[in-house]
Amino acid sequence: MQDMLKDISSELRSHLMPLDFFYSKNNSKLPKISSIKDVKIPDVERNLLAHHNDMTSTLSKFHDSDLYIEVLNNQFNDNYLLRMVVLKKTKDNKPVEFGAIGINLSSLDNSMVNEINVGRKPLGKLLEQY
């Protein structure tokens, strides 16, 4: 990962760590990744990608549907969870996003951790709820 991402900021690299973990675990290479300025992204895509809101509510509004996750893979380590998921629309089960996330469970409410472990609701939805 380091060679491919040498021109990307350390902050972006840290966001890619969960994805890199699962790709490495499966002996797969990450797809080509580059950073671009948000002004170079077309309007519709920019509204979906370049914002300060949570991604779950942004995608839910755009697709006019609640979302759920399909967990493709996960890894627990003490109170830290890495998971790779597909977000899907509840109204037709179509995928709208693929991604991986790291979640520090130690500071979260027990009922929220239980829902995270069930693996059905996106983290953004749970953060709204709790």
PLM regions and their residue ranges:
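N-terminal domain-onset segments
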Residues: 1-82, 86-130
